[in-house]
Each structure stands twice: as C-alpha cells, then as structure tokens.
C-alpha cells in the first residue's frame, strides 16, 4: 500500500476497519508535501558535533487518510512508560537511535503508541510491526513531539 497513500488515494472507512492497511513512513506525510519541505537547513552544534534540524509548518501536517484508519506499520521502539511486564507506551520511530542518539524526526514522522499488552523489554533493539487504529494527535513526550497516536492491538518482530 505504500506509495498509494502518498499519491493521495482514498480508501473507504469500511475497508479500513476490516483489514489493516500496511503503510510505510512516507505515507505519514500528506500528499503533495515533499519531505525536503519539512526539514529546513538546520544548524550544526559544533560543540556536540551534531546537526540539529529545523522544521517548518509542514512538519506537523498529517495525512488525512490515516485519521481513524486501521493500519500496520514497521518501526523501532523508544520506551516512554514501562511496567514489570514490559513497555506499555512508546514512540514508534523510523530508524534505530532516533530521538536518543540523533535529533528527533519531525512530528509527522513519529507515532505515540499505547498497548494494553506490554511489549517485552528484551526486544527493544528489534524492528517491530505495530497494528492498530491510527489517529491524529499531537503528543509531547520527554523525547519528542509526535503527530500521530496509535492504539496497538497487535505487535510482532519485523522480519527483514
């Protein structure tokens, strides 16, 4: 399905509720907004040898097709809340180390995920598939601001 959403295709809500639509990270950006228009030139933090991106108003623009959609997408876990059983909320990020070892991607490239079934803490470096209902919701966390929220119903290790 990746690419079809980016091209602006619309899907009937009834179809979204029956089967998860597999999406990729580029599908989070609304049609007609190139990624290059989200991230500005940024600045170099010479002291820490780190490039700090600058985002414009496009960084919070979300894909309207995804609001309320039942989706499946891959990503990496940045834990926010944990219990003795595992991670109960996290930021789903497009690459390992996002928000921790590198500056965070723009809000429309980050998903705040909650799950009723905790994800084991020993699998945090593995890519995962997350399936559930996606929504538009700006959430500020200690690691980054997210543009999407996802109520996870299913999670599994992403097999490369």
Indicate residue ranges for each PLM-predicted region.
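N-terminal export signals
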Residues: 1-17
């Amino acid at each position: 399905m990746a690419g079809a959403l980016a091209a602006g295709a619309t899907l009937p809500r009834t179809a979204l509720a029956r089967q998860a639509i597999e999406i990729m990270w580029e599908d989070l950006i609304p049609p007609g907004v190139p990624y290059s228009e989200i991230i500005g030139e940024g600045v170099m933090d010479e002291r820490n040898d780190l490039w700090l991106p600058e985002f414009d108003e496009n960084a919070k623009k979300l894909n309207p097709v995804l609001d309320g959609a039942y989706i499946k997408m891959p990503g990496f876990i940045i834990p926010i809340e944990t219990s003795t059983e595992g991670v109960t909320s996290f930021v789903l990020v497009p690459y390992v180390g996002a928000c921790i070892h590198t500056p965070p991607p723009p809000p429309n490239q980050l998903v705040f995920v909650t799950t009723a079934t905790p994800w084991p803490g020993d699998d945090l470096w593995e890519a995962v598939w997350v399936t559930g209902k996606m929504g538009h919701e700006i959430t500020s966390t200690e690691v980054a601001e997210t543009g999407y929220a996802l109520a996870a119903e299913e999670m599994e290790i992403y097999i490369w």
